[in-house]
Amino acid sequence: MNMFFRLTALAGLLAIAGQTFAVEDITRADQIPVLKEETQHATVSERVTSRFTRSHYRQFDLDQAFSAKIFDRYLNLLDYSHNVLLASDVEQFAKKKTELGDELRSGKLDVFYDLYNLAQKRRFERYQYALSVLEKPMDFTGNDTYNLDRSKAPWPKNEAELNALWDSKVKFDELSLKLTGKTDKEIRETLTRRYKFAIRRLAQTNSEDVFSLAMTAFAREIDPHTNYLSPRNTEQFNTEMSLSLEGIGAVLQMDDDYTVINSMVAGGPAAKSKAISVGDKIVGVGQTGKPMVDVIGWRLDDVVALIKGPKGSKVRLEILPAGKGTKTRTVTLTRERIRLEDRAVKMSVKTVGKEKVGVLDIPGFYVGLTDDVKVQLQKLEKQNVSSVIIDLRSNGGGALTEAVSLSGLFIPAGPIVQVRDNNGKVREDSDTDGQVFYKGPLVVLVDRFSASASEIFAAAMQDYGRALVVGEPTFGKGTVQQYRSLNRIYDQMLRPEWPALGSVQYTIQKFYRVNGGSTQRKGVTPDIIMPTGNEETETGEKFEDNALPWDSIDAATYVKSGDLTAFEPELLKEHNARIAKDPEFQNIMKDIARFNAMKDKRNIVSLNYAVREKENNEDDATRLARLNERFKREGKPELKKLDDLPKDYQEPDPYLDETVNIALDLAKLEKARPAEQPAPVK
C-alpha cells in the first residue's frame, strides 16, 4: 500500500449524514500507551535468534561486542536524526548495551521496550514544543541554516540544544510552506494539523511496532538483507511475489486522519462498482452481519486489514465522496483475487524510421515472470522487431529461479549462476532445455537500483556474449536470502490465541557469475556506461557498513552464445557522438557538474526567504527554459509559466531513447556479421 501523507486543509470535525466524526487530540504524555511485549513475542524472539545464529551465511557470535552494535543500530533506527533523545538518555541505556544478546535469546526484551517508550515520551514533548514555536512571529531574514541529515551528529546535551534543533525544524517547515505561497495563517493551520496528527500517531503505536524495530536492528546488524517480517509485512511480501491479493482492488493512502482512495486496479471490485472514485474517503468498514466500524483516525495498515478478505466474501464501505458538503453512502463490494498488473512485465514498441525495437519493462522477478515474458516475446515477434531491450532499471530483484529461467529464454543451455554456501559448497543453477525462445539482438538496460536477480540476469547475458549491457553500474547485491515462516504446526493447538508469528529472510549463500566473479559490492559494469544526473550518490551495496565482502571462485564451464566485444568500439563511438549532440544529455551533464559542485553542501539549506526564493526561481527558470527548448524541437507552443504545464505531461526518457538507438546499431552490426561457431569457456 502507498502510505505517504498528503497535507490538505480538512476540518478536524465533520458533521456527516447525521453523525459527528471526531478524532481526539492527545494533550498529555500519559495518553500515549506504555508498550509491553505481547505473549507471543518471547517465542518469536527465541526462534529468530536461533535461526540467525545457526543458519546465517555470516557466522557470528551474539556476544557483548555484537550486542553493543545491535544497540547502536536500534538507537539510530529509533532516532535517525538525533533530534529526539538527549545524550543523557542514550548514556542511561548504553550501560545495558552488552545485555541485548541475552535479551534476544531469552525473549525478554526490556531494554528495547523501555528505550522505545522513552523515545515516545520525548517525541511527544518535541511536537508539543513545535506547536508552541508556531505561536511565535516568523522571521526569515537571518542567516540561519537547517541540516537535513543529522544521522552522524551527536545527540543534544540538554533541552536547550534540543529546542534549538526544533526551532530550526519548525522554521524549515514554515519556510517550505511560505515558498508555496501560503499566508502565515495558512502555514500555522497546516503545521498545527501536521504536528497534532504526528502526536495522534504516537498513541496508535503498538507492541508489534517495537518488536519489529528490535528484530530489524538485530537482523540488519548481521547484514543489510536480513530481515524480520511482521505478520502484516509477511502478507505484503507474499502479495509482491505472487502479484496477487484478495481484496477490493484499491490503493489507499492517508490524508490527515482519513483513509483515501489513491487509485483503483482496472477490473477490480472497487472500479467495477462505479460507486467509488479516486479521492473518496473511507470512514467506515463493515463485515457481513456485523456493525459498521468507524475508521477515522485509524492507522492505514489497520484499515487495510479490515478491508482485505477471502475471495467471494463481502465488505461494506462507508464512503465520504470527494468534495465539500457531501453525505456518506454505503457501498457493498464482493472481494476478488486481484492481479497487480502494474508490477508485471510491460511490453512496448519503439519505432525509429522503418525499424521497430521491442521493450520489455520488468519491475521485479516475481513468480511467473518467465511465462509472462514468453507471451510478450511472441507478440513482439509478430511485430517484426529488429531487436529487444530488457529494461531492468529500478528492479530490486526477486525470485532466483525466475532469473535462471528468464536467462534460459535467450541461450540454448548452460549454467546461469553459481551459488556458494558458507561451507564453501558450490552449486550451479542452469538452463537445461536446449531451446532458445528469442535469438535476435538483445540489449539489457540497468541502473544503480538494479539488484540481485537483475544482476544475475544481466551478468549471465554479458558473460555469454548474448546481450549488450548498457546504463549504470548496478547495485552490487550478490547474496541469496532464504524465506522462512516463524509459525509452527503446533502453535495453533497449544496457543490458539496467538496471531500469525511473521517470518524471516536471511542470507544463506553468495552468488557468482559463470565467469567466477561476484557481483557483491561491485555490481555489473555495463558495456556502455551512460552519464547520470546524480553522480556518486551513496546508493549501492558498497555503501552499507556491514555488507559481505567481494570475492571470486573458479569459473564454470559454459559455451558462449556470442561475442559482442568486436562491436563495442563502434557502438561506443556512435553512442558518444549522439549524446554529445543530444540536448537532453547535455542538460544531464550540466546537472552532473552542478551536483558535484554542490555535493558537500547539499544537506545544508538556508532559512532565509530571499535566498531560498532566489534558488527556487533559478530552478524554475531553468526548468521552464528546458521545457520550452524541448517543445520548440517538437513543434509545440511554448509555455509562459510552469503552471501551464499539463498535469499529465510525460517527461521524455533519454536513457531508454538512447538505448533504442544502441539496439538499432547492434542489430545492423549483427546482421552484417557472418555466423560464428561458439566455443566453450573454462
UniProtKB/Swiss-Prot annotation:
PROSITE patterns reported in the protein's UniProt record: PDZ
Active site: 452 (charge relay system), 463 (charge relay system), 477 (charge relay system)
EC number: 3.4.21.102
Outcome (variant: residue 474 to A): Loss of activity. Perturbs protein structure
Highest taxon, organism lineage: Bacteria
Single GO MF descriptor: serine-type endopeptidase activity
Keywords carried by this UniProt record: Cell inner membrane, Cell membrane, Hydrolase, Membrane, Protease, Serine protease, Signal
Any single Gene Ontology cellular-component annotation: outer membrane-bounded periplasmic space
Chain positions covered by the region annotation Disordered: 635-654
Outcome when changing residue 463 to N: Reduces activity by 90%
GO biological process, one term: response to antibiotic
Bias kind Basic and acidic residues: ranges: 635-650
Record note on what altering residue 477 to R does: Loss of activity. Perturbs protein structure
Membrane topology summary: Peripheral membrane protein
Protein role: Involved in the cleavage of a C-terminal peptide of 11 residues from the precursor form of penicillin-binding protein 3 (PBP3). May be involved in protection of the bacterium from thermal and osmotic stresses.
Family stated for the protein in its record: Belongs to the peptidase S41A family.
Name of the protein in question: Tail-specific protease
Gene that encodes the chain: prc
